[in-house]
């Protein structure tokens, strides 16, 4: 039997306390505010040398594409603020050249996603991940990633792509599993 999370904050608290165990990510900060945006959780991927933004959702009435590209654009246009946040929170000395901005991504975590949300990230190269989280009556937790089934690139969309997608697409590159395991 699954038991619902009462608040989005409950999901956030659980994940932030376990970013290393769940995603092999180093927790940096919670509720990072920059300009008019507030990022739920900021993490750093030590293996890929990149920042990862985690957003939590309890409802199904939001666009992951709009929010994801807005946050990646915010990051890429304010790199020094992200490095400063890391250095101040981790008491470290990360430099701009130490970060692979092209590997940055946004993870969305929710008890469920609707069909439109799942289809919106159904491209091989969008830097977004959807993870469904469930809590069971025996206090067990499950996290399941929605896997893209498409080989289509978002870069192949015809017509006017929004400038934010173009700008982020120039800097962020999603690596395939085949590329990831070459040379390892």
PLM region descriptions:
Residues 1-184:
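Charged, terminal alpha-helix-loop-beta segments
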